[in-house]
Design a protein with these regions (language model features):
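Charged, amphipathic alpha-helical segments and their flanking helix caps
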Residues: 1-25, 38-121
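A short, hydrophobic beta-strand-centered structural micro-motif
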Residues: 30-36
Length: 121
């Protein structure tokens, strides 16, 4: 699966309709970005190995309190649910996790990250 295919799939999510999604760089203030997919190899406890593609989707947003943080977490949770229900053609979503922001930037924004792992079928 190509980066372009993954990017187009991500941008087709209803919650991103009309939003600009930067590819491989963070927006200055409020916005969305997606990292270039990284190929990962994992091994289970029995020694079986499989490959997947990992992408991080970042939501950078101005935050003034916990209500804002909860609203952003809901946005990412809805995107995670959509991704699991509508995986890219020929793939399945094997992991989808949301990371809490580590710190507030000088501009007053926080970065919330959704990590998706896609396994090609």
């Amino acid at each position: 699966m190509t980066t372009k295919q993954i990017y187009e799939w991500l941008c087709s999510a209803p919650m991103l309709a009309g939003e600009k999604v930067n590819l491989d760089y963070l927006p200055t203030y409020d916005g969305w970005s997606m990292t270039m997919p990284r190929r990962r190899t994992d091994t289970d406890i029995l020694g079986n190995a499989w490959e997947s593609l990992e992408i991080n989707i970042t939501r950078r947003k101005s935050v003034s309190g916990n209500a804002d943080r909860l609203a952003i977490a809901d946005e990412l949770d809805n995107l995670r649910f959509w991704a699991k229900q509508n995986p890219p053609e020929g793939c399945r979503v094997i992991l989808a996790g949301i990371a809490k922001p580590k710190s507030k930037s000088a501009s007053g924004t926080e970065d919330f990250v959704l990590t998706l792992r896609l396994e090609e079928l």
